[in-house]
């Protein structure tokens, strides 16, 4: 196939600011990203927002079976050409990733999620993938591109300025790491900020915890992060009393409460 940059030029395609698009053309960089999940030969990979298909090409070169969801109709002809070049490996679905059921699309098989997430929906998709009631999930790993600031919030330790709701939701039942930083100059057009690849793999879930309760607790707690817990959590019935019973001082602020403490509080409220 011709180089991706040439294919994009021939089709007269440009990145859409409205869709949060920034294209990657560096094949070596894309191959490095596709290698982060490990051996994908024969594996199923779900990709969000492939755009013109740069990362898709790299994933297909690993031997993976890729299911790609793209809402930008301008990109569909390029992806159709890619499907012809890799027969039987690529399925393209024209839809909004927020509207699809990944487990249903993958036929119940385990899968990896690899995506250069559009900046405008990345966090919403990420938290959705972290909140299924059943655990471990069907996904085996998440390899996701975020703005560096968001990536740092996902892996942040307790007590740091970056630590917040994203860190708790990511770390309470998954292992999270920054696998790679990507300079803004690697993109076309260059975004205003640096990016990073975050990789997550499922860990054992602490027993007796309802993810919906944990989600609500952290939403309240970190929604007013400068307030003491006795103020930020007072809208949740029994939360302050449960915190005191667990030895969590209600005069503390949310950013000082560890992942394990948030989990213990969610468990107590779920009884």
Curated annotation (Swiss-Prot):
<keyword id="KW-0949">S-adenosyl-L-methionine</keyword>
<feature type="binding site">
    <location>
        <position position="24"/>
    </location>
    <ligand>
        <name>S-adenosyl-L-methionine</name>
    </ligand>
</feature>
<dbReference type="InterPro" id="IPR011530">
    <property type="entry name" value="rRNA_adenine_dimethylase"/>
</dbReference>
<dbReference type="InterPro" id="IPR020598">
    <property type="entry name" value="rRNA_Ade_methylase_Trfase_N"/>
</dbReference>
<keyword id="KW-0694">RNA-binding</keyword>
<dbReference type="GO" id="GO:0005829">
    <property type="term" value="C:cytosol"/>
</dbReference>
<keyword id="KW-0963">Cytoplasm</keyword>
<keyword id="KW-0698">rRNA processing</keyword>
<dbReference type="InterPro" id="IPR029063">
    <property type="entry name" value="SAM-dependent_MTases_sf"/>
</dbReference>
<protein>
    <recommendedName>
        <fullName>Ribosomal RNA small subunit methyltransferase A</fullName>
        <ecNumber>2.1.1.182</ecNumber>
    </recommendedName>
</protein>
<dbReference type="InterPro" id="IPR020596">
    <property type="entry name" value="rRNA_Ade_Mease_Trfase_CS"/>
</dbReference>
<feature type="binding site">
    <location>
        <position position="116"/>
    </location>
    <ligand>
        <name>S-adenosyl-L-methionine</name>
    </ligand>
</feature>
<dbReference type="Pfam" id="PF00398">
    <property type="entry name" value="RrnaAD"/>
</dbReference>
<keyword id="KW-0808">Transferase</keyword>
<dbReference type="GO" id="GO:0052908">
    <property type="term" value="F:16S rRNA (adenine(1518)-N(6)/adenine(1519)-N(6))-dimethyltransferase activity"/>
</dbReference>
<keyword id="KW-0489">Methyltransferase</keyword>
<comment type="similarity">
    <text>Belongs to the class I-like SAM-binding methyltransferase superfamily. rRNA adenine N(6)-methyltransferase family. RsmA subfamily.</text>
</comment>
<feature type="binding site">
    <location>
        <position position="70"/>
    </location>
    <ligand>
        <name>S-adenosyl-L-methionine</name>
    </ligand>
</feature>
<feature type="binding site">
    <location>
        <position position="22"/>
    </location>
    <ligand>
        <name>S-adenosyl-L-methionine</name>
    </ligand>
</feature>
<feature type="binding site">
    <location>
        <position position="49"/>
    </location>
    <ligand>
        <name>S-adenosyl-L-methionine</name>
    </ligand>
</feature>
<dbReference type="InterPro" id="IPR023165">
    <property type="entry name" value="rRNA_Ade_diMease-like_C"/>
</dbReference>
<dbReference type="InterPro" id="IPR001737">
    <property type="entry name" value="KsgA/Erm"/>
</dbReference>
<dbReference type="GO" id="GO:0003723">
    <property type="term" value="F:RNA binding"/>
</dbReference>
<feature type="binding site">
    <location>
        <position position="96"/>
    </location>
    <ligand>
        <name>S-adenosyl-L-methionine</name>
    </ligand>
</feature>
<comment type="function">
    <text>Specifically dimethylates two adjacent adenosines (A1518 and A1519) in the loop of a conserved hairpin near the 3'-end of 16S rRNA in the 30S particle. May play a critical role in biogenesis of 30S subunits.</text>
</comment>
């Amino acid at each position: 196939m011709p180089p991706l940059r040439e294919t994009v030029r021939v089709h007269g395609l440009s990145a859409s600011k409205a869709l949060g698009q920034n294209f990657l053309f560096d094949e070596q960089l894309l191959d490095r990203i596709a290698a982060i999940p490990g051996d994908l030969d024969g594996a199923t990979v779900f990709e969000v927002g492939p755009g013109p298909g740069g990362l898709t090409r790299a994933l297909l070169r690993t031997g993976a079976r890729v299911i790609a969801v793209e809402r930008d109709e301008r990109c569909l002809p390029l992806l159709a050409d890619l499907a012809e070049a890799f027969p039987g490996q690529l399925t393209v679905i024209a839809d909004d990733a927020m509207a699809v059921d990944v487990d249903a699309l993958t036929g119940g098989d385990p899968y990896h999620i690899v995506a250069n997430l559009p900046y405008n929906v990345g966090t919403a998709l990420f938290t959705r993938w972290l909140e299924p009631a059943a655990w471990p999930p069907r996904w085996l790993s998440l390899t996701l591109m975020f703005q560096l600031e968001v990536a740092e919030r996902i892996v942040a330790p307790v007590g740091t300025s970056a630590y917040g709701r994203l860190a708790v939701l990511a770390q309470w039942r998954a292992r999270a790491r920054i696998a790679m930083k990507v300079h803004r100059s690697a993109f076309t057009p260059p975004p205003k900020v640096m990016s990073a690849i975050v990789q997550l793999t499922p860990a054992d879930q602490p027993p007796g915890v309802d993810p919906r309760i944990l989600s609500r607790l952290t939403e309240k707690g970190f929604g007013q992060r400068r307030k003491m817990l006795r103020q930020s959590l007072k809208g949740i019935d029994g939360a302050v009393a449960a915190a005191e019973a667990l030895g969590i001082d209600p005069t503390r602020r949310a950013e000082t409460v560890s992942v394990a403490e948030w989990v213990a509080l969610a468990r107590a409220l779920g009884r």
